[in-house]
Design a protein with these regions (language model features):
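Short, well-ordered beta-strand micro-motif
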Residues: 55-57, 155-159
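Short hydrophobic/aromatic beta-strand or adjacent loop that forms the aromatic wall/cage
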Residues: 51, 150-155
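Short amphipathic alpha-helix that is part of the acyltransferase structural core
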Residues: 1-40, 153-155, 166-183
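Conserved catalytic-core motifs of GNAT/GCN5-like acyltransferases
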Residues: 111, 124, 128-148
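Active-site rim helix/loop that mediates acceptor-substrate recognition in acyltransferases
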Residues: 29-58, 62
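Conserved acetyl-CoA-binding loop-helix of GNAT-fold acetyltransferases
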Residues: 83, 89-103
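Conserved GNAT acetyl-CoA-binding A-motif
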Residues: 104-119
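Conserved beta-strand in the GNAT
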Residues: 55, 61-70, 75-82
Length: 183
């Protein structure tokens, strides 16, 4: 099997040489209901101190992106994670996720669609292979846009599901910081 190229993360900023590729991936990998307006996303790269956008690079080639938030002292939240279509199924996503988790050194939570059909089950399986567990906590994602609908999703974490009180605080922090919603 061919060895994977060297992976690095590069903070995305308005002057990043691969910002155009990252923006195109953001807009095509995630439907409009699963992402914020692109202009706002670009602005957040320099104005939101808890928001981090990273280009995934393989030997100086743009391979994907990870956006994440520092929610609490104990938890980070991966909002978006995507690999460019030409590099999918090559193992780069798993290497990138493992590298992110080892460099971040903390608890991470993310949202996934309920396991009602094949694609969400495959996505959940991918995260499980990289140390995440599907939490039983009922969860709804606030809309990214005014007037949008709340989506029934599931949370996964690289730790065991917290006790109910801690879970509620985590969801409240996620909703307030990421979506601007007061529960």
């Amino acid at each position: 099997m061919k060895p994977l190229p060297r992976l690095t993360f590069s903070p995305l900023r308005p002057t990043h040489p691969h910002l155009h590729a990252a923006t195109a991936l953001y807009e095509t990998a995630f439907p409009e209901v699963e992402r914020r307006d692109t202009a706002l996303w670009l602005d957040m790269m320099t104005t939101s101190p808890c928001f981090h956008a990273l280009a995934i690079m393989t030997d100086d080639v743009f391979a994907g992106l990870i956006t994440w938030w520092q929610l609490t002292e104990d938890y980070g939240y991966v909002e978006h994670f995507a690999i460019t279509p030409s590099l999918r199924s090559a193992g780069i996503g798993g290497v990138a996720l493992d590298k992110f988790l080892s460099e971040r050194k903390g608890n991470v939570v993310l949202e996934v669609e309920p396991p009602t059909d094949e694609m969400p089950r495959r996505r959940i399986g991918f995260y499980q292979r990289h140390g995440f567990t599907l939490w039983a906590l009922p969860y709804r994602q606030p809309p990214y846009r005014r007037g949008g609908e709340w989506l029934k999703l599931c949370l996964m974490g690289n730790t065991a599901e917290p006790a109910p009180e801690a879970s509620n605080r985590l969801v409240q922090a996620l909703h307030q910081l990421v979506y601007g919603v007061e529960d």
